[in-house]
Amino acid sequence: MKILDACCGSKLFWFDKDNEYTTYMDIREESFEIHGKKVNVTPDVVADFRPMPFDDDIYDLVVFDPPHLKSAGPNSIMKAQYGQLDKNTWPDDIRQGMSECMRVLKPTGTLIFKWNEAQVSLKDVLNVIPHQPLFGNRRG
C-alpha cells in the first residue's frame, strides 16, 4: 500500500509519524518553537500540493488536509502548525490541490479530505472543488 499525505505539516494527527508506507509532503521544512511549543515540519518531499512531483495513479490512499486559515497573526500557533491560505487565491489553490490529489490517486484508491471551518465554510470549499465527497460532516 502506498499512502500520500499531501500537506503533512507537523503530522499532528498521525500516530506513526514515520509510517513506512507513507510519503509525507509539505511545502516547507522547518523546526521552531512558538509560545513554548516545539513544531517540527519534516516532510519526506518538500513540494507544493498544486503541482505535485509524482506520476499519475500511484497512491492507494491520499490524505489532503490543506491549510484552512485565510488570516492569522504573526505569532499564531495554528498558522505555524498548519500554514495559511492566500486570502485572494484560496479557491483556485484548493481546486488545484484537489485535482492533483485525484491525479496521483489510483482509480480504486481513497481520498481523505480534512477541513476546518474556522474561516472558510465547507459549503464554500465544496463549491470550488472538482469532485464531490461521498460522505462527511454536513454542518457546513
What do these predicted regions represent?
Residues 1-140:
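Class I S-adenosyl-L-methionine-dependent methyltransferase catalytic core
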